[in-house]
């Protein structure tokens, strides 16, 4: 089997699981272009997010308050993961699908 060159490798979300580490909700694991795996814990178990409460106005306030977290341009960071998985779509499944698309296209505009 031929190996892909380093240039053709991209960051890839490998798994999203409930976190076993308190106080986090989820753990996202990524395969990085250098061949290493990186896991990030994010979300707080004791607090609601958009996938739980479904309040659009509350979601918009969260996005306004946390837009600065996206300045890092690093989708592995907890702020990115919270914004695009917990506060993006009404379901985690829908948000995860959108996050994978954004990761593929490198499109990090604010959720609408």
Functional labels for PLM-detected ranges:
Residues 1-112:
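Extended terminal accessory/targeting regions
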């Amino acid at each position: 089997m031929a190996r892909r060159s380093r240039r053709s490798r991209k960051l890839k979300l490998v798994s999203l699981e409930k976190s076993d580490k308190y106080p986090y909700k989820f753990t996202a694991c990524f395969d990085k272009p250098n061949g290493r795996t990186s896991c990030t814990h994010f979300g707080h178990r004791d607090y609601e997010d958009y996938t739980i409460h479904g309040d659009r106005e509350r979601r918009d306030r969260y996005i306004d308050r946390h837009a600065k977290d996206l300045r890092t341009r690093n989708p592995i960071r907890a702020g990115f993961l919270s914004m695009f998985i917990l506060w993006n779509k009404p379901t985690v499944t829908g948000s995860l699908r959108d996050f994978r698309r954004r990761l593929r296209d490198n499109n990090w505009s604010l959720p609408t």
